[in-house]
Structure formats: C-alpha cells, structure tokens
C-alpha cells in the first residue's frame, strides 16, 4: 500500500508507532503499537470516537501498554520494520477505504480492521467493548456523510467543536453574567437575524460599552425561550480566531479550517448563529500572496443567508477596516451601541452585584454601586461606562478579599516595620559608641511594643476571618441551588423545583442569616481589622489610588486643614494676603463640592514684580494639597514664543515627527490629573498659545494631537506674568485698588478679552517691604537649621543678625531673591568652611550674631 495515500493524521500515528517500537526495543511495528499511538494523539479524536462507540478508552490504553511490554525485545536493533500482522491489517484498512469511496485512507478505518482482527490487538480491543456495528455508527456520525477527499480531511472534522465556543451552553450552565437593560439593542439584533438575506447584525460601539454582553444576553434569552419562534433552540457559537490561525503552518491550512467551519454551519441549516468578536480581524486574516483573506471567504455565505453571523467591533476599527471593504460592509446591518447613562449603569451593576459578591466572598452595598457609577463617570474620562464602573466594583471587592485572605494592611505594615527594626538592631549592635548604644535601647523598646501590638491584632484577625469565610461558603451553596432551579424549570421538572425552592433554599437563606449575624456580633467596630463590605468609601479609595484625586469624604482633620489653609500657606508665602485668600477660597469651594464641575478648581493670573512670591505660592499650594511639590506641573512659556511651538504643548498632529510622543502639557495632566499647572512668564508665549487655553479655562478639557480628551477639571491653573511690575513699584505708596486698576489697563492691552474673561481671578502681588523680607529671612534660616540638624548641629541666630541679613538682602526691584544670596555669602559660606576645618562637630551649637559690623560664629559645646 502507498503511504502517501494515508491521511496526515494516520501518517503521524504510524511515525509515533515506530517510535514506540524503538523505545521498547521491539524488532517489528505491531498493531498494538499503532493502536496505542492513535489513542495518545494530542487532539484526542480517536479517544472521542471510541467513547462514542461505547469503548472504555482509558482501560484500553492501559491494556495496550501492558501488552506491548510483553512483546519480544531485541537489544541493539536500530531499524524496525512493519510486522506481518500490521501489514495485513493495513491492507484490510485499504479495502475498507475503497468500499467507502475514500481517496485517502483515514485512521478510523484501521479501527474497523482491528474490530475484525483475530490477533492480540483485536482481542484486547474487544475485551474493552469494541464492536464493529457500534463503531460503524460512530464513524458515520463523525463523517456526516462525507468521504475522505484530502490528506487533511480528518483534522477538519468537528470543526465547530474545535474552533468555536458554545455560548448557549455556557448560558445553560450559568457561566455567563446576567445582562441588564440593552433591550432595544437585543431586539434590533433579533429583528435583523430574522431577515431573509443580509441577516447579519454588527454591533458597533466604544470599548467597554457592552457589545459582547448583548450577544450573551441573546444567548440567555434563547435558553429561557424568550425569543421569537424562529430563533428558539438555536445555538450561538463564538468563533475562536486564535484557534483558527494557531499552528496553520502551510499555505491553505487556515483557509481549509475556516471552510470546514463554514461547511459545518451550512450543514446545521440555520440552527447556528456565529458570533465573531473583533470582526475587523477577519479582514486581512490569512492573507498571503495569491490567497484570499477570511473576510472574502465569508462574503458568499453572508450574501446567500447561509451564515447567520453577529459581528462586534469598535467605531474606529469599523471605519478603518470594514468600511473600506464596501462589499463586506453591505452584508452587515449596523447596530450602534451607545454608552449607557449613569442611571442605566447603576441598574447594570445591581444585576451583576450577586455574581461579584459570590466571586469575592464579600458584600457589595448599594451606596458602593451608586458611587462606582457616579465617580467613574466624573473622574475616569478616558474610558466608558459600564466597563469602568464594573472595574471599580471589582477592584474594591478584590482589595477587601485580599485583606481577608492575606494579612490586613495594618498587620502587614507592622510586620514590615518589625523586619526593618530587626535589621537596624543587628547593624547598631556592632557599634560601640554612646549614641549607638542609646539608639539600640530605643530600638529594643520599639520592637517589644510592636510585637505585642502585632500579637493582639493577629488574634482579632483570625476570629474575624473564620466568621467571614462561613458566610461566603453558604452564599456559594445558594448560588448552586438557584442554578439547579433554573435548569429544572427549563426541563419542566416542577416537583423537584418546588422541593428546592420551598425546602432547600429557605434552609440555606436561614443559615446565611445566622452566619451574617454571627459575623456582625463578632465585630468590634473600634478594633475591627477585616472589612467584609464594599461601601462608597472603598470605591472612592480605588478612584483616589488610580487618579490621585481625593474623592473620599473629608475627614475632620482635612476639614480643619482646609479652614486654616491661609495660615499654612503663610508659613511659606509672606505678605501676599489677598493672593493667598483668593487661592484658598477656590480650593475650599471645590473640596466642599459647590464649585462648577466642568471647570478647573481655579484659574488665576498672578501679576507682580520678580521675587515677590508668585512661583513660591504655587509650590506652597502643591505642597499643601499633595504633601509634595512633585504635583506642580511647571511649564516655562518663554519656550513657546514661535507659532509652531503650540504643538509641543498638545502634541504633534498626525504625519509629523513626534506624533506618538504626546504634548508636554497634555501628557503631564493625563498622568497627574490632580495637580497645580504653573504656566510661568505667560506673556512671553506666542498669542496663538492662548487660543488653546480658552477651552481649558472654560470647559476644563483639552484635545491632544491624537484626538484624546484630557481632563483639566481637577487642576488649579496658575499663570504668572511680569506685566505691570514697573507700575507696581512706581505706585507703591498708592492704595491696592488704584494699583490693581492701573495694572489691569496694561494687562488688557496685551491679552485678548476672551482670554481674560475666562480667568477666575487676576491677582496683583505688591512689592515687599523691609518687614516682609525679615519674615522671609527667618523662613530661609529655618530651612538652613533643618539641614544642619541632619549633621547633629543646632543653629541659633540672634535678632540683630536676622535684621542685618534682611537689610543686606533687601532690594525693592528684585524682591526676596537677593536675600538668598545674602544668606549664602554671610552665613552658609563661613559655616561650611568651619565644618570642614573641624571647628564644629556633632552636638555643637552654631551661634550666629552680628556686632561691630560683621557676623560672628563662636562655638558653644552642649
């Protein structure tokens, strides 16, 4: 017989049989070897066929293995030949193929030959249930009336089972999430599916709006019988594109697989609906020189109505791939899936609530659901509902689940702190000086205190964890019973439904109530370690961590901090009372929730001479709001003096170099949406730059070069300018209102009215006087004292020395900047020299005084 007339799978089985014979030192390849090799093939087709014929495939595999071990062995034989028994069986197989009209000999025909075999292989197979009649029936069912016309024919069988996932089956066993709402879209899809031709809906919408969920909803309705008569008992299959492409090594192999899928669907005569998620991937899939792609292979079947297909893709990809192929586009009917409203999202989340509670073993409260929908809509602007709201619920529940399963955050922090202290203790033990011994004593005390605290917390945690897990187990059992009730209702077994619904279910609900009550009674709110509920506060925490925006309810400490905001800012900014008050009011309005949600927290134009605290106030504000100056986005507008430099702020347009990189301003705000944006020296920028700032100041949004909307609603925008600084110095003796009026006139000549009209406040910084400079000197000296404290040195400076520094560093034209230079020259330089000379050592006091026209530094030892 010719080996090239065997199917590819049969040839592979023969090669595996040869390897088996070599591995067992058998001189001949016997039917036992080939039968075992077929059973061990990775796709499991032979096993499935034998199982259909009522054969115990697992038992047969073990028996064949044992029989091979009993075959005669020859040591050193490098060549194996086809044995006489196998040769005669292969001839019998060929006859079976001719009888059936096959062009290639398939592996299942060898099983028919084995069924009639009088040798060892036939005996073992019959012992495990192999019968010719049952096997023939199984082969006919698998072949579906087809003959074997190509070498790849076997691999194309049962293509639907291999390359699709049955969505209706998943709905039947309760694997799919419930689909709430979307009735109009599902009804429209059903309407299109009932057409005579072009009965193929394509769901188009933004990522995350629920396109796939609509198809899942359709599958659930089919299972529940809530569809028109023509759709009842149909199957919804999801095409596995990755499975179709994976391992298609040779040209034409992918096309053969897809053709097999289409043929199988055609055989089902309209009882199958094929769902292709990300349908744009079909355009160009499998394309090679001289070959047609998957999209073109689908067109004839779609046009004839043989293929009921539902597609899903995003708006961008539909435009980019499907619309370009007009012939493919006309075969689909568009169903637009819009983003649901906040109210609709809340309804969707309530439907999913039970599934997520069950998965995470926690309780999700209704305030958490409302907060997830509202906060995601307001603060996560680059994604779409309901996906982003579901993500918040999922992550908040996962966080609480993680606390239950692993150590709570409080214990984890204690544990890490203990490890840190123990490492430090070992390091300090090696030192012998007095300071190190004192430090060792403190470390020992701290370790003892923390270990006691940790032991107390561990005891509470274990008790709470046991109670939480008890309730979760009962919830899982309730879910299983509900799924069983739904299945029995579909099958019409109402007696069993009644038994479960009125017997088992109330019993479990009673258990759950008891478990929840036990959990609640074990709660000691002040000491409670484990949270078992997801509330609005937990959702707010997730949003805050993701965006850096403080959306949680204000604690009393933060309320007090905001009420005393002016005092905190005045610790760094001296003399500019009006500026500090205006900025503080803007922040309080936004944090209290009464500011316009569609505008930035505040937009200010700071005007004044150099060195009076404009930039310092921005730094102080960033430090106050975020405890870090890193949230200050500072852009020097003198870099944007040319017209074309606007693109550097928002990113280059398509086709230009740097398109992928994004803009300075837009990228910085996308990464830190809650920040202070400082546009320094704004009057030096090109007038066209102000045009892009108009929509930021008015609507709190800006579109970057890639078409993405960047949200500025949680930023404070500050622009500084030196316009009118000469007027401020010349009119120093005039009242603030007169100065502001004069400066305002000059500002109006430089900036456009539509720009000035959108700014919340124009703040005029007045020139600093001698008293202000003295206060600033004390702030600067405190910073120097803090730096010296790191070296265990104490700085003590007398009032005459401060006064002299203030007078030396006072210049009405340059503001406070000369003061820094005065401190550097008069204090820092001499002290640095003395430290290097060894005149000051740790524990010393560095006294600074001024008399007889110069500064003195007389060492004092403590």
Swiss-Prot record:
The protein's role, per its UniProt record: Part of a stress-induced multi-chaperone system, it is involved in the recovery of the cell from heat-induced damage, in cooperation with DnaK, DnaJ and GrpE. Acts before DnaK, in the processing of protein aggregates. Protein binding stimulates the ATPase activity; ATP hydrolysis unfolds the denatured protein aggregates, which probably helps expose new hydrophobic binding sites on the surface of ClpB-bound aggregates, contributing to the solubilization and refolding of denatured protein aggregates by DnaK.
Region of interest (NBD2), residue spans: 558-767
An annotated Gene Ontology molecular function: ATP binding
Principal localisation: cytoplasm
Species per Swiss-Prot/TrEMBL record: Ralstonia nicotianae (strain ATCC BAA-1114 / GMI1000)
Residues annotated as signal peptide: none
PROSITE patterns per record: CLP_R, CLPAB_1, CLPAB_2
Boundaries of every Clp R domain copy: 3-145
Name under which the protein is recorded: Chaperone protein ClpB
Record region (C-terminal): 768-862
The keyword Nuclease belongs to this UniProt entry's keyword annotation: no
Residues annotated for ATP 1 binding in this entry: 205-212
Region of interest: Linker: 340-548
Repeat 1, as annotated region: 6-71
Keyword Acetylation among UniProt keywords: no
Binding site for ATP 2: 608-615
Alphabetical list of Gene3D superfamilies matching this protein: 1.10.8.60, Clp, N-terminal domain (1.10.1780.10), P-loop containing nucleotide triphosphate hydrolases (3.40.50.300)
Keywords, in A-Z order: ATP-binding, Chaperone, Coiled coil, Cytoplasm, Nucleotide-binding, Repeat, Stress response
Domain of life: Bacteria
Chain positions covered by the region annotation Repeat 2: 82-145
A GO BP entry: protein refolding
Record-level GO cellular component terms: cytoplasm
Family named by the database record: Belongs to the ClpA/ClpB family.
Subcellular location: Cytoplasm
Coiled-coil region: 390-524
Pfam families: AAA, AAA_2, AAA_lid_9, Clp_N, ClpB_D2-small
């Amino acid at each position: 017989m010719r080996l090239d007339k065997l199917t590819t799978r049969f040839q592979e089985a023969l090669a595996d049989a040869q390897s088996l014979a070599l591995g067992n030192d058998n001189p001949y390849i016997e039917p036992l070897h080939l039968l075992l090799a077929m059973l061990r093939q990775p796709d499991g087709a032979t096993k499935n066929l034998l199982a259909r014929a009522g054969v115990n495939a697992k038992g047969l595999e073990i028996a064949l293995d044992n029989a091979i071990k009993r075959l005669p062995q020859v040591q050193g034989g490098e060549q194996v030949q086809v044995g006489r028994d196998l040769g005669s069986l292969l001839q019998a197989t060929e006859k079976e193929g001719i009888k059936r009209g096959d062009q290639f000999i398939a592996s299942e025909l060898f099983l028919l030959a084995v069924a009639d075999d009088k040798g060892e292989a036939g005996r073992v197979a019959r012992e495990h249930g192999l019968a010719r009649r049952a096997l023939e029936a199984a082969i006919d069912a698998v072949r579906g009336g087809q003959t074997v016309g190509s070498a790849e024919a076997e691999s194309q069988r049962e293509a639907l089972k291999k390359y699709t996932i049955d969505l209706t089956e998943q709905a039947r066993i309760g694997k799919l999430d419930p689909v709430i709402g979307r009735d109009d879209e599902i009804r429209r899809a059903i309407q299109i599916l009932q057409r005579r031709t072009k009965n193929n809906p394509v769901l188009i919408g933004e990522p995350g709006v629920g396109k796939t969920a609509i198809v899942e909803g359709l599958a659930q309705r089919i299972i529940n019988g809530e569809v028109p008569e023509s759709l009842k008992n149909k199957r919804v299959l999801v095409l596995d594109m990755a499975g179709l492409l994976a391992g298609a090594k040779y040209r034409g192999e992918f096309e053969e697989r897809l053709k097999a899928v289409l043929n199988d669907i055609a055989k089902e005569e309209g009882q199958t609906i094929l769902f292709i998620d990300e349908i744009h991937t079909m355009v160009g899939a499998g394309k090679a020189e001289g070959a047609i792609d998957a999209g073109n292979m689908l067109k004839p079947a779609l046009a004839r109505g043989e293929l009921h297909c539902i597609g899903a893709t995003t708006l961008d990809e539909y435009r980019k791939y499907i619309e370009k192929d007009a012939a493919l586009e006309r075969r689909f009917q568009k169903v637009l899936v819009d983003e649901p409203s906040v109210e609709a999202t809340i309804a969707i989340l309530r439907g999913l609530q039970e599934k997520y509670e069950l998965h995470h073993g926690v309780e999700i409260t209704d305030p958490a659901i409302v907060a997830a929908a509202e906060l995601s809509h307001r603060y996560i602007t680059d994604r779409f509902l309901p996906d982003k709201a579901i993500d918040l619920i999922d992550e908040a529940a996962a966080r609480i689940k993680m606390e239950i399963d692993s150590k709570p955050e409080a214990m984890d922090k204690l544990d890490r702190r203990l490890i840190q202290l123990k490492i430090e203790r070992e390091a300090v033990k090696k030192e012998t000086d007095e300071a190190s011994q004192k430090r060792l004593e403190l470390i020992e005390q701290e370790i003892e205190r923390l270990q006691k605290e940790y032991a107390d917390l561990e005891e509470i945690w274990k008790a709470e964890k046991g109670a939480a897990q008890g309730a979760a187990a009962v919830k899982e059992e309730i879910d299983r019973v509900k799924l069983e009730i739904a299945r029995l209702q579909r099958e019409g077994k109402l007696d069993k439904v009644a038994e479960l619904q009125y017997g088992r279910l109330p019993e479990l609900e009673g258990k759950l109530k008891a478990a929840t009550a036990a959990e609640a009674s074990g709660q000691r709110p002040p000491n409670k370690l484990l949270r078992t509920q997801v509330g609005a506060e937990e959702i707010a925490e997730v949003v805050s961590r993701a965006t850096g925006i403080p959306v949680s309810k204000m604690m009393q400490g933060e309320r007090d901090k905001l009420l005393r905001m002016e005092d905190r800012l005045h610790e760094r900014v001296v003399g500019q009372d009006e500026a500090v008050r205006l900025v503080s009011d803007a922040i309080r309005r936004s944090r209290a929730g009464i500011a316009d949600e569609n505008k930035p927290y505040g937009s200010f134009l700071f005007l004044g001479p150099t060195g009076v605290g404009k930039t310092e106030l921005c730094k102080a504000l960033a430090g106050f709001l975020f405890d870090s100056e890193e949230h200050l986005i500072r852009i020097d507008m003198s870099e944007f003096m040319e017209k074309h430099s606007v693109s550097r702020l928002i990113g280059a347009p398509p086709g230009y170099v740097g398109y992928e990189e994004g803009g300075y301003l837009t990228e910085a705000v996308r990464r830190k949406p809650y920040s202070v944006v400082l546009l320094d020296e704004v009057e030096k920028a090109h007038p066209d730059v102000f045009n892009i700032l108009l929509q930021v100041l008015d609507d709190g949004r800006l579109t970057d070069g890639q078409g993405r909307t960047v949200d500025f609603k949680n930023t404070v925008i500050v622009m500084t300018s030196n316009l009118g600084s000469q007027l401020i110095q010349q009119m120093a003796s005039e009242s603030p209102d007169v100065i502001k009026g004069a400066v305002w006139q000059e500002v109006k000549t430089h900036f456009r009215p539509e720009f000035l009209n959108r700014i919340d406040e124009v703040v005029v910084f007045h020139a600093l006087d001698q008293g202000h400079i003295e206060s600033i000197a004390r702030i600067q000296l405190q910073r120097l004292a803090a730096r010296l404290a790191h070296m265990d040195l104490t700085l003590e400076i007398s009032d005459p020395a401060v006064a002299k520094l203030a007078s030396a560093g006072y210049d009405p034209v340059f503001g406070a900047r000369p003061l820094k230079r005065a401190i550097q020259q008069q204090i820092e330089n001499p002290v640095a020299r003395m430290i290097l000379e060894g005149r000051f050592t740790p524990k010393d006091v560095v006294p600074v005084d001024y008399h007889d026209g110069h500064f003195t530094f007389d060492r004092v030892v403590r």
